[in-house]
Amino acid sequence: MLLGEEDIIQALSTAQTDFLDALAEGPEAVLTFQTRWGVLRASIDSDLPLQPSTLELSDRVSYAIADLAEVLLTQEANNKAIEDDLSNDLVAQFHQYEAFEALEFSENDCEWQENMPPVPPFIGACYEWLLQHLHNPYPSNEGRLTPPSSPRSACSILPSLKPALDTCKTFDDIDRWFSAARIRIGWTHICDTKFGGDKAMMLEAARVMWGSSDEEYEERNFAAGCVSRRSVSPKREEIPSYLKSPHDSIAFQARLPEAHEEPAERHCTPPREPPCLDPDVELAFACMETRAHEMYAHRLEPSELVDTLSASALPREAVNDVECQEAIARAAHEKRQQARREQRQAKNERDAAQMREEQRASYPSPEPSSDDEGEDEDDEESTDAYDSEASDSEDDSDSDTDSHYSQPFASYARGRTSFLSDVSALADDEDEASDDDEDDNVEGDDESEEEEEEEDTTPPPKLAGSKRRADEDIDGQAEEKRLRSASVPHFMYPPSPKSPMVVKRAAHKRPTRRASPSLIRLSPPPAPVTMGPDGVPLGTVPSKTTKAPASTSTTKSSTVQVHIPLPAPSSRSIPSSGIKVTGDPTPWVNWDLNAAVPCGQSKAEYLDSVGSSRPQRRASTSSSSSTSSSLSRTPSLTSLSSLSSGSSVSTCETVGTDSSEPAVHVQASETATEAPIKSAAHVHPLFNPDVWSQYNLDATADVEFHRGKGRKASSFRPAKLLVEAVDLSTSPSQHWTPSVRSRTRLAPSVAAPVTSYHHAAGTVTSPIESSFGQGQLTSILSTGPKAGITRRQTPPAKRRVSPRAQEPVEPSSLVDDIISSGLVVVCKEITPVKAPKKDRRYAERAERRASKANSFDSPDTVRARLAEIEQEAARLEAERLSLQRIASVGG
């Protein structure tokens, strides 16, 4: 129930006093105040109109109560901490005092034991006999007389006291010791207080306490073992009334007769309950037994060491020689089995290392040179033979891993990563591989069983060689890694971790590789790699391609290549495809620049008209202003649809895919790829200012894309230039002749620069200017026709490897394009100064002064720096691929 404004003011006025009173009364009052406070808060937070003074009063009261509660909580926490500290200190002092007392007592005990005289030898035997005869601690002086037997021991006095009798001269010492022992354990005191000094009654009560049944008692004669020689009734049917417990009564439980029993059997005497002693007498006997056990416990009981030695030391006759021999034989057999297991494990490790080497050999990397000329000749012969075989097999195959690159843009090509076979074929290969592995495991088990059945006399092989071999492999791998870092490698991009690739070993045959023409996956970005939810690296884009007609052996399938689109000089043609830009609010969009081509006119005709004159371009552009461009907006990466754009200008077919979506099969007949423009004089609409003037890059974002004469809003603001997809021509590159083609190398000898799919984004400042960071450029540099890997004839650990000579680092064509395009500001070339022949340092000083005067670097410096960046990026990419390949094969 909500309160009114007057009630709220009254409650706020007394809130602090009520809170303090509730704290003083107890928890129940605090709960009541909390309930009232909740109602007050709900009333204030409701829609009830309140005066500003009321709201101000509520704020002041709430802040005051909050501060007070915080102070009380802090004080309670401090009190709790102080209480805990005091209790911990008291407990620590108590433990310390106990430890000190225990230490002092142990020291005093040790001193007391050291000062004690030695125990006579006969006391041990007498004490043991006393503990076993507490029901009658009166030994006889004659060997034939024995005390009453007890359930604990049935031995007589003669054998038990024989050591004591042998060590003492008279019986007086034993009698005096037994008299003192009976006094110490309280036998005499119990006899005087409980039984009035009557030893016979004391012995009878002790028999009831520690003795046996009545039948055994009738057969014994207590008078023979008693020192007092008093006449004792040999047979007692009942216990005197003063020995019985006043709380217990003798009761008989009559057994019910059964039907098959005879009448004579039914009238049998019921069993008699055992007699009971008075509780005080039983307690006195129990205390006496305890004192008897504690009398010489600290002197005569064996220590823990004696118990351990006695338990572990077995007599020799108890050991069975046959069992000992069997145990020794089993231990030897287990040792041999362990040695064989270690041998098989070392063999498996060597096989795994060899498998990794073979898998690593399937990817191109620089071959280490050798000082031995014979080995170089053998390697060259094997390389040439393999290249010829590879070229023949590639010509016969329908689909090849090579791509068709146009002559002007061969330097922009990059190695692609594609699926090696169809999904169905890969599934069958996986089944076959699993079956082969199971067969290998079965054969390995059979071999291990045969090895275990061999003679036990054969010593296990030494495993030191395997360790030395592993060290040699490690040294060889380190040397190979050093050589790889010294020279720039060729390499192919591996598929994503989710690609169903199965690596199968072959005895003397290099694994074959097939490329599916209808399924292509772009390479993953360099490290660090961001993985998607399904395990596929972000940036992997499935794309549609068209299978080229296999008219000749040199026909190749079209490939999607990714690079930075930069304005190239007139000697090179401009990419005839779309670009991808990023901006707000759409993270990834596909901007189809082909929309600038008017309807009813082909791209070639339009570019011819554009190249002829500038006014014609403006007219053609304005004539097609009514045609709207198609923009694909997806929440993630959009497929490179510019490759699949048809001849129609107003349509742009796009396929929206997720960045983490795995590649799927696409029929080759679904799209049609338009051949690029081969003329070098044509200008792409991307670099046409008239086309750029039709777009408003500064307008706010909306849902549609508009293009017209006026400045209309666009659906994005192109602030970053990302990548460009280029559909290269079907003509092969000049570097890919049949004599140098190889399956192990998917890049031409003059390799292409590569840019990261994610991180090579440059800022677009104008339609003709863009800037890129130095760390965003990567490249694949070539090392000549011997860049491919050939099968090693000898293991790397046994070959003499010498470091390869450093080759001069030459920048790729991308560096020249960047410098010649004007995107990078460099200083002009300095006119060389003629220096006197005598002064060799004059030219250097003049060059340094000239370089200090100019804030920009020379083109040679920029070119050298970019070449170094490309080389370093290629090395890092090679190391990343090597680590990814090792992780994929389980190494």
Swiss-Prot record:
Keywords: DNA-binding, Homeobox, Nucleus, Transcription, Transcription regulation
Location of this chain's protein in the cell: Nucleus
Bias (Polar residues) ranges: 651-660
Statement: the UniProt record of this protein carries the keyword Transcription regulation: yes
Bias kind Basic and acidic residues: ranges: 331-360, 841-850
Compositionally biased region (Acidic residues): 369-400, 427-457
Cellular component GO terms held in the UniProt record: nucleus
GO terms, molecular function: DNA binding
Free-text function comment from the UniProt entry: Specifies A-alpha-3 mating-type. May regulate the expression of genes specific to the homokaryotic cell type.
Family of this protein: Belongs to the TALE/M-ATYP homeobox family.
Name of the featured protein: Mating-type protein A-alpha Z3
Organism, as annotated: Schizophyllum commune (Split gill fungus)
